[in-house]
Amino acid sequence: MQRRFLSSISATAGNTKTLNQGRWSVKQVKKSNFHVTLDEIRTSIDSSDFIALSLQNTGSYAAAWHRVSAIDTPQTSYLKAKYAAERYQILQFALCPFSLQGSKLTVHPYNFHLFPRDELKCGMPSYSFSCQASRLTAMAREGFDFNICIYEGISYLSRAQESASKFLSENPILADSVTVSSSPATVADTVFVGRIRSRVKNWRQSCIDSGSKTGDDDLVSSLRRLVLGSEQYGSRLCLTIDVCSERQVQLILEMLTEFSDDVVPLLVASKSRGTQAVRTVFMSSKEDKDLFKRELKDLEKEENRRVRGFREVVDFISSSQKPVVSQNYLSDFTSIHAKFLGPLPSNVDDFSSSLSSAFPNVVDLSQFMKEISPLSNISNLPAAMSSLNRFFAPVDVEVANQGCPVKLDEGHQSHGQNAVMISQLFAKLCTIQKSDLSTIQSNEDFQALASDEHANSVTSCSKNAGDENVKVWSKNSRRVSSENLVFIWGLGKKMTAAKLKNVLQKSHPVFAREFDVKYIDRSSAILVFWESGPSETFLSAVNNEEQLDGSLREMVAEGLRGAGYETYKRACRLGFWEADLAESLDKALESSDTDPDSDTKPSEIDWSNELAINFDEL
């Protein structure tokens, strides 16, 4: 494939300035300075060409097998990321809008402290969330201040939660334009509308009369309003009509179009997210009507801004349509979708479609890195930067927003600097790619190429989901169909993978062919058959103990069980996230999967010896 390159950065000898990450000033944004910083953030985003982001969550996985690994298809990878995103909370959101001009990288780093505070007393954004002890320990070691997070963290609502919150606030909602119902009116509808029309007519006439000079004293006027049920909405007269159903709401709104010149209908929401009343407000003139609607919209806008909190920044990023650079696309954007957009869909295709509507251009830095250095691991940013030292890629970093610098203790670092490192790594990768091509002259060309070549992770994820191919760039990688994978568990004795392979070779003729063994966690292992056929033979043998003999019969008698890749996919799809994979596979075998979207198409897996679980890390 012809490679298109992204950068107009010039690589001039002797023009390199190296900045230690501890010297980068990252603006820390908390609840106390959030609103006064919003305009500055919007300006930084608008003036930049790219946006780097990095999240710090309260955890990433609850068990070893919950981590995305080489054996996962895009769908199972997404389900694992979805489970983590719904389980753990974002405590820090590092954002770094940046621009590239020649060898100069201009960054605007911010680090937002978040905490899901239930300010509306309605269980949103979250009643509770999970924490991973090792993650919190690491954050404390880095100097993370949990007191600031809890007391000064910025709260937020997702777009879906904001829509729901309108029904929980006490502010009436301006009724939308009415469309006449297509269903025929019943006798009960006709009687109801006639009664309400008469009531509104009398009330409206009293409002008109009260506006003109009459001989009535204040007492008589008050009694008349009391009899007609007239109330005050601010300085304006209003009438509240209680309703029992949304059908009655529709009928009242249709009827009120007869009085649209001087009557404005408002909906009074109930806590059950329905409508409990329609409030009609009398307008003294057309100018008064226009002013009233503007007041309502301003009030709604201010209320929405108050409850959405940090999501205002997410909306800035989305509306800018700038390419977003992420170190870990799947983990970051499942968390962003769950916390700031709405509930995560059940499959990766719907997720990609939903995400692309908000963030159409996403640069997956891990994939970009593998094009330059296929054997590199980008999970550690300093290590990834070091792996590029063999390339001549000078980048000068200039921090544009110098306000609120962070003084770091020795050994401590601000999470906000991760986003700066991501932008710097991206710039270096662009410089390396560009070195093989003629110089691209303009930054506009740079943006266009970025969008074409590397900023379509959302689309490519959806395409890969259809093919169900896992691409793992690692040494000694071999592609294998998911039909040739077998999960085994219930091993009576603890043994290494090499010893288990040796035992299996002596247990059944099927193991005379080439195969491999890897542990997934402490409870289960996976058999990789490099040819088609042996996996079905082995599973058939394990499930028919009477036909077995020798050591394999003894292993089955001691509790050995086996299942194909479809059982693993079913466990992920049905949410059997037990601590041990063996328990999840047992539940999946016992369950009846009636999911119509379940996919039985075989998948291809890239297998790598380097991606085995290291039990020392568990």
UniProtKB/Swiss-Prot annotation:
UniProt main location, coarse: nucleus
Co-factor requirement: a divalent metal cation
InterPro entries: CAF1_poly(A)_ribonucleases, RNase_CAF1, RNaseH-like_sf, RNaseH_sf
Disulfide cross-links: none
List of residues binding a divalent metal cation: S54, Q56, D332, N418
Superkingdom in the source lineage: Eukaryota
Enzyme Commission number, as recorded: 3.1.13.4
Reactions catalysed: Exonucleolytic cleavage of poly(A) to 5'-AMP
Residue span of region Disordered: 588-607
Cell location: Nucleus; Cytoplasm
A GO biological-process term: mRNA processing
A Pfam family annotated for this UniProt entry: CAF1
The entry's keywords: Cytoplasm, Exonuclease, Hydrolase, Metal-binding, mRNA processing, Nuclease, Nucleus, RNA-binding
GO cellular component: cytoplasm; nucleus
Protein's job: 3'-exoribonuclease that has a preference for poly(A) tails of mRNAs, thereby efficiently degrading poly(A) tails. Exonucleolytic degradation of the poly(A) tail is often the first step in the decay of eukaryotic mRNAs.
Name of the protein: Poly(A)-specific ribonuclease PARN-like
Annotated source species: Arabidopsis thaliana (Mouse-ear cress)
